Amino acid sequence: MMQWIRTDSSVQQPVFIRRFSAHCVLRAVLEITGLGIYRAELNGKRVGNDYLTPGWNDYDAYVRFQTYDVTALLETENELRVTLGEGWYMGRLGMSSGPMHHWGDRFMMWARLSLTYQDGTEQVIETDEDWKACASGILMASLYDGEHRDDTFKASEELPVEAFDPGYCLKKPVSPPIHIVTELKPTLLTTPAGETVLDFGQNFSGVLRFENFLPFGEKILLQTGEVLQGGCFYRENLLTAKSEFLYVSDGVRKSVEEAFTFHGFRYVKVTCRLDIRPEDFTGVVLSSDLKETLRCETSHPLLNRLMENARWSRLSNFLDVPTDCPQRDERLGWTGDAQAFADTACFQADCKDFYRKYMEDLRIDQTRYYHGDLPMFSPSLRGTAGIGGAVWADAGIVIPWTVYMHYGDEALLRESYPLMRDYTEVRIQKDRDLGFTHVLFDEFTFGDWLALDGLSRKSVFGGTEECFIQGVYYLQAVELTGKAARVLGKTEDAERYEQLSADIRNSLMQEYVTDGGRLALDTQTAYVLALQHGLYHDRQKMADAMKRRLRRDFYALRCGFTGAPLLLNVLLDCGLVDEAYRILLSEEYPGWLYEILHGATTIWERWNSLEEDGRVSDTGMDSFNHYAYGAVCNAVYTRIMGLRCVSPGWKKAEIAPKVRGAIRRSRIEQETVSGTWKTAWEIADDGSFSLSVSVPHGCTAHVVLPDHPEAFEEDVGEGEHRYQYMPARDYLHPFDEHALILDIMRNPQADAIFAEHAPGLHALAWDPDSDVRAKHLDELSWGVPRALRAQADGLGEKLRKVELA
């Protein structure tokens, strides 16, 4: 019997107290947990440095407990105090103004303090009725709404506790705790509205700390926000989340820090009768304590900032669960976001145990509530989340396989195989129910969520046919589950899934690809999925069709959550390197660098979370810290920088950078379970190209040299390898008579030559209603007046002199 304690239900944010004597103690170990979340102190000193313990999972399945060595905190007479806040267990949680008390409505805790004395004897102090309880000065402790703390409060009496057994299964954590990552100092702003605002210079997740300068009874209110509007404080995008810290001072000089909440923010509005000093305030950045494994940079400052933004969004949203956003009244473990970003996350940090726990969350939801299927988000709040549908529910397939490829842990793959198998079997049964055509599904899916080719500007559903997306992800689920079965020696499963995947592919081809090789759908995401999953008769023909689609879109991306994470990978794999660079490095809306030029320090939820005039979009759903679109960094790491894992656990990698002169240098170092991989490349001033590769002990690499005049590639073993040559392509002089006019317009030097040499054609190209910018210089024989075509004569030769910096 595990004996927990609780007190009168009217006591909000209670403190549980145990006093005891201890002499000549050799070692003291505290095992402890609490629901919702707890903070423990022994003799006035904090126990451990974890935040938001015990963390978030489905508490009906298990409750995690933490273990701390508290020997150094012991005195002769001791007082252990444990304060509880609502957390995920009791607090407001869910979409919009979500309900409270998903798992319970009573605070409770369990603890066991094991004392080993110098004479070898032992004593165990457990939660029982010898403990006392009292009210705390924490008046509100909500994950969404923040914390209200009154340090003038003194509990009038101590209350008895009730010992009971709630029947919870206690379990040691498998994932790392939430810790402080770093700390940020703000600058002080006075807005046009007269508001006092702290700017931390970086959007992040965490809590606020300040040095208390207030006299007794004085209040300070700190409210958080992500962006300014018109230079003034703004927080409407948080929806119903108050996200604030209200503090009433006891007049004691000390550090004051929130303990039972977290916020996603960059700016803090300060309401206080007294003047403040920015140096008294600190932004405490919180994230699951994952080892950073990636070091990389390029010669392109905005691309470097994009990679850093993706990292900050991962830090902000990896708080025990991979959430979608850290700021508004949501903060849920959305499965679609998680699967899209998983590969990128595993590059950035050691995510194995973090994802192990999330796969446990998925498995609990799958078996308890969804009969083999998977939810939109996990934990699912006791099955109240809807079915995830294609792409989202496929987190149960993509994440286990991604984790296996990065870490090569066959035991973990075996542990997660039932998750993969049962979800795949649900898809197969759905297929059978619909006649086993392998194509048409009639269930909900978010599709290409937030794509820009929907029915209207505010549409959340993209233009790619949902049945096609469902069919493609059905194919992927069967294929990857078959691969997992093959790895695990489950031959019967493997053979069945391999045959079925071939049948599904054939059915999808019959439905969506003509005999002549044309795709029946004409969206960017449709081409991405077809090329990614081998749905073509002729790959080059399908790639050419995608190129034409991009051209009709003026090389602006239109993809959403399904297509965008894969877009650049597909383009680069299909040899559409110019197109990939053009989209990635575009500074115009929509695009990744557009966000940065509009002040982004994390990845946005929507391409237009901020409009071009700086206003927050009127879509009613705008998070400025959403990592899903940060998955583009995977293409940067694996294709542009050129370091790609091709066998489980990084035993073999492919080094095949896709190079253009817009990026002159690249360097990446990746710590893996097999050692540290390094690759760096550079375009010299004379146009020569150099590549260096460092292969860890016991590993091999397949090296493909970009634009080598002899199409050189080779396999190499451990050690250092260096290559230098003059490439067949002139990376530094990209313009000639075949140049794309859009590329010319985006290069200031080339655009100036264009304007001087062909002023009329230049003006037409800059006309937003003209399609000239989507043409190449050698394609002006149609759709352009003859007089303007003549202006282009000799322009290509002049443009050859333009050299990329």
Show which residues each predicted segment covers:
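Compact, charge-rich alpha-helical regulatory domains located at protein termini
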Residues: 731-804
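Heptad-repeat amphipathic alpha-helical coiled-coil interaction surface used
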Residues: 404, 475, 479-482, 494, ...
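Alpha-helical support elements that line or immediately flank enzyme active sites
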Residues: 28-32, 207-224, 271, 337-365, ...
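Active-site acid/base region of carbohydrate-active enzymes
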Residues: 37, 134, 280-309, 315, ...
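Non-catalytic C-terminal accessory modules of carbohydrate-active enzymes
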Residues: 101-112, 125-153, 162-163, 172-174, ...
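Extracellular/oxidizing-compartment recognition motifs
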Residues: 1-328, 336, 353-356, 369-371, ...
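Alpha-helix capping and helix-loop boundary segments enriched in small/acidic/polar residues
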Residues: 5-11, 29, 55-59, 69-71, ...
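C-terminal capping/lid segments that line or modulate ligand- or cofactor-binding pockets
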Residues: 80, 149-150, 329-330, 348, ...
